[in-house]
Regions:
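A short glycine-rich, Lys/Arg-flanked "PGG" loop and its adjoining helix->strand segment in the class I
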Residues: 108-121
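A short beta-strand submotif of the Rossmann-like class I SAM-dependent methyltransferase core
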Residues: 95-98, 107
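A short His-aromatic
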Residues: 101-102
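Conserved beta-strand signature within the Rossmann-like core of class I S-adenosyl-L-methionine
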Residues: 120-128
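Generic recognition of short, well-ordered alpha-helical segments
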Residues: 105-109, 135-136
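Conserved N-terminal segment of class I S-adenosyl-L-methionine
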Residues: 1-88, 92, 108-111, 145-159, ...
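Short, glycine-/aromatic-enriched active-site segment of Class I SAM-dependent methyltransferases
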Residues: 128-148
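Hydrophobic pocket-lining residues within nucleotide cofactor-binding pockets
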Residues: 75, 98, 127
Length: 184
């Protein structure tokens, strides 16, 4: 019985391009949808906002917000809608589950580029906490406790963000994810 349940709930092995928002495990699916819902609420979106989805991946944000002007940028040329995101003047920028994949100097460079693009922008971030609870949660899902391509820890990322921007509000969602809104 345990193996059947494990297969049903944890049949996804860690690999690139997992669509977490449509995951077979209903708990995983709910978690990813809820944290994105919080991020969207934090953004206080308006219909006339120009929104940059930085690190858009498969464009899930645009799929769930079709009535908004969202431009997706990703380093994968197959996924990006714009080659040079710095040409935009976005009102809102989402960097959801992406900053931890970058080196500290890259994060700082990107935040500085955001500040040059529009002095009045708002940034919404989602960053995994990578705490003991986060690691054990991953293990329960049949995944490795660490992610090989997570380069920068939450503490270091927050230090950069606090040096470059002003924190508007934050929440540590279920102790595994840090969601925040920032302004210049």
């Amino acid at each position: 019985m345990k193996n059947k349940r494990k297969k049903y709930f944890y049949d996804t092995i860690e690999k690139e391009n997992i669509d977490w928002h449509e995951h077979k495990n209903p708990i995983v699916k709910l978690f990813f949808r809820l944290k994105f819902a919080i991020a969207i609420r934090y953004a206080d979106l308006k219909k006339d906002d120009l929104i940059l989805d930085f690190g858009c991946g498969d464009g899930w944000l645009k799929k769930i917000l079709p009535d908004y002007n969202i431009i997706g940028y990703d380093i994968d040329p197959k996924l990006t809608e714009i080659k040079d995101y710095t040409k935009l003047k976005p009102d809102k920028i989402f960097a959801l589950d992406i900053l931890e994949h970058m080196k500290k100097r890259e994060i700082r460079k990107i935040i500085k580029s955001f500040k040059r693009m529009n002095p009045n922008f708002k940034l919404v971030t989602i960053i995994p906490t990578e705490t003991w609870f986060w690691r054990k949660s991953r293990k329960l899902l049949g995944l490795s406790e660490t992610v090989k391509d997570h380069i920068t820890k939450l503490k270091d990322t927050l230090q950069i963000l606090n040096e470059e921007l002003t924190l508007v509000k934050k929440i540590n969602f279920l102790a595994v994810t840090h969601i925040a809104k920032w302004k210049k």
